[in-house]
């Protein structure tokens, strides 16, 4: 609501142009999107400054672009929906670029998407078939692509990313809202979880409604196999003094990012609004970022580790009355033992944390 209030203030001053999704129930007369559209037109002298559309799926980007004297100078992108859930409940990321070049690119894509006619011709345009690469000294290495793509370009992008995941040398970390869609990228991620060649740690939102269609991969002593945990559908009985876990309306994990080799020679994170699903990448309005910068990658790595550690604990279906981290009378079962056993994932995790980044 607070963001909507500010947007409507800008609309009243004729300082806002907006593309708002109208897929499915987003265009219902009783929808919040419809209410916002009507309020926009009530306060603005330029009712055409709001355009509804969905390409051929969803208008799925989450972007703000700032302009001064008709020149873009700042842009916000990422996975965050500008809603109460998106800001206060979901796990999300947002990235702000102050590069004029990056901001202008997003502004040009916005103009090329503004209105249903432009959306219908976007797929196949230069914006949808080009990887926009920024390698200036003032920026980290960045590649940005804009969907919906023609099938050949979606395949090219997905092949490049899945090959990088399959070739991970030190680690793979991820937080993906839904990792079971048809996608060579998501297949590569799932395959890494099942192997022990690199440290793999990840979280998705929902495994299945009854946890039978797909399985979580929890910590297994004396094994280096990866972890994949779920954030929703958990039915834990928490140990005292904790009570019942509050239900969440919507997603807990809304991220869509994959980190490859955060301690390797060429760390990279793939992030943005794309769900990394092959079909939607050919239908939805989306943006996918590839960032080669150790500091940025480390920030995403910490987020993945934070989420997995918490929800792994939640996934264990705790039933005991007390939770003992350590038994001082029996150090053979001390909680930290596994962190020093060669061949154990915990030991691999400790070594990853303390190791120097490769150069």
Question: Where do the protein language model's features map onto the residues?
Answer:
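Beta-propeller domains
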Residues: 129-202, 208-209
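PLD/PLD-like phosphodiesterase catalytic module centered on the HKD motif
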Residues: 4-89, 96-103, 107, 112-118, ...
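Hydrophobic transmembrane signal anchors and adjacent membrane-proximal interface regions, especially
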Residues: 72-73, 125-127, 132, 142-146, ...
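Aromatic-Pro/Gly-enriched surface loop or interdomain linker
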Residues: 89-93, 98-157
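N-terminal carbohydrate-binding/catalytic regions of secreted carbohydrate-active enzymes
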Residues: 1
